[in-house]
């Protein structure tokens, strides 16, 4: 069993550079299906989810060459399949991102229901309802989504009930070749949406309004391959900046746009952290106690759900009490029970977490419940008394490249280790 061991109490300070955004890279990889030929993606994170998406594309007929650690050359000239295998899709929810591109290229698709972190229902109803407005017909059976377009794809106005990132992306990609114009109302506004729109436009698409609540896609003919650089990962950046605030000494994070963490950084300042913004990075440190601050997660430009666990870790050591409200995923407080094992005082009431600050954490064995919760447990171990051992780290490795090595570069005493499974039997 693979674990991350962290010894608390060491000074954490220094500088790190984040990788390309996981949530952007996966969708950009899927989008290459729509432009037959050779597309080069740069600044791609070397993480488990990217490896899975690569396998999905290969099963569909693509070839992928790895030029270097962060550059992929994807040739989709010979993609001739439109069905994704369950054993791959079950590993990663983002694999549904191929639904729109396959419909766009072939007019049909068979996609297994998604997997990934178990942090909510993550229903794809909005994907299906939205695509139906464009003329796509669906039959969901035996764990697979069967999509067909007997009359082609026709532009329409689609109003999303919730600003879903995945639904917005699938609608954007499916409508690129539609007859007429598609308007997505109440579209997701995340930076990763803008990154996808930028690459689609580079390929020859006509996408306008990305980053706003209304996106307009004018149908075009063929797309052409491009070379594109993935936007920096704002969530990885936020994680390391939160570490700077937790541990106290300055941590500088490069390789991202601080505007993409707008509300997070403002909340950090309300918590008493010092935030120094630069053009392509940011530095965070702390000169006094952590101040209690209420948080509620919302789609961008609101507070990201992907920063909720890391922020809870900070607030668990605040001088007072506060409330964290989770409005995006219903099961994203699973991490709280593990943090309680380390001494946190947290009460869960529905989609609210009441957090009472405690003086410190105690190192112990904890189990990563999901990607961000796992990272937050490692983060807590940096300031805990004694050694913290985090298991189920495959969740962490889905989204963070070289997490331990970056922590070590900042001064942490941490290591990735393998221990006998029976040592963790009581935690399973």
Model-identified regions with their sequence ranges:
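Structural preference for solvent-exposed beta-strand-turn elements
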Residues: 1-428
């Amino acid at each position: 069993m693979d674990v991350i061991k962290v010894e608390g109490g060491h000074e954490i300070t220094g500088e790190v550079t984040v990788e390309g955004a996981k949530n952007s890279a996966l969708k950009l990889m899927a989008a290459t299906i729509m432009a037959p030929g050779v597309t080069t993606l740069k600044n791609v994170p070397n993480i488990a989810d990217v490896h899975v998406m690569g396998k999905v594309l290969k099963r569909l007929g693509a070839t992928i060459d790895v030029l270097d650690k962060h550059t992929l050359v994807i040739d989709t000239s010979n993609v001739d399949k439109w069905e994704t295998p369950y054993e791959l899709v079950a590993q990663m929810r983002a694999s549904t991102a191929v639904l729109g591109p396959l419909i766009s290229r072939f007019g049909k698709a068979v996609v297994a229901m998604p997997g990934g972190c178990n942090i909510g229902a993550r229903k794809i109803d909005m994907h299906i309802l939205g695509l139906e407005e464009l003329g796509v017909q669906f039959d969901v059976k035996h764990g697979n989504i069967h999509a067909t377009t007997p009359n082609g794809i026709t532009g329409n106005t689609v109003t999303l009930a919730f600003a879903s990132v995945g639904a917005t992306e699938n609608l954007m990609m499916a409508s690129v070749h539609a007859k007429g114009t598609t308007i997505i109302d109440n579209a997701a506004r995340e930076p990763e949406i803008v990154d996808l729109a930028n690459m689609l436009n580079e390929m020859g698409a006509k996408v306008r309004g990305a980053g706003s609540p209304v996106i307009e896609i004018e149908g075009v003919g063929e797309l052409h391959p491009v070379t594109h650089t993935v936007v920096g990962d704002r969530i990885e950046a936020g994680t390391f900046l939160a570490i700077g605030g937790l541990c106290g000494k300055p941590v500088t994070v490069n390789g991202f746009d601080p505007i993409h963490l707008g509300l997070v950084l403002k909340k950090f300042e309300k918590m008493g952290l010092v935030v120094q913004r630069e053009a392509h990075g940011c530095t965070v440190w702390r000169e006094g106690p952590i101040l209690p601050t209420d948080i509620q997660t919302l789609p961008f430009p609101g507070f990201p759900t992907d920063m909720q666990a890391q922020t809870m870790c900070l607030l668990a050591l605040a001088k007072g009490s506060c409330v964290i409200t989770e409005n995006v995923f219903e099961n994203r407080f699973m991490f709280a029970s593990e943090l309680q094992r380390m001494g946190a005082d947290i009460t869960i009431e529905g989609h609210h977490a009441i957090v009472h600050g405690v003086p410190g954490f105690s190192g112990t064995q904890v189990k990563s419940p999901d990607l961000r919760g796992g990272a937050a447990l490692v983060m807590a171990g940096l300031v805990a008394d004694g050694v913290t051992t985090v298991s189920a780290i495959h969740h962490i490795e889905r989204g963070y490249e070289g997490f331990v090595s970056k922590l070590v570069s900042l001064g942490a005493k941490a290591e990735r280790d393998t221990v006998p499974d029976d040592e963790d039997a009581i935690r399973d």
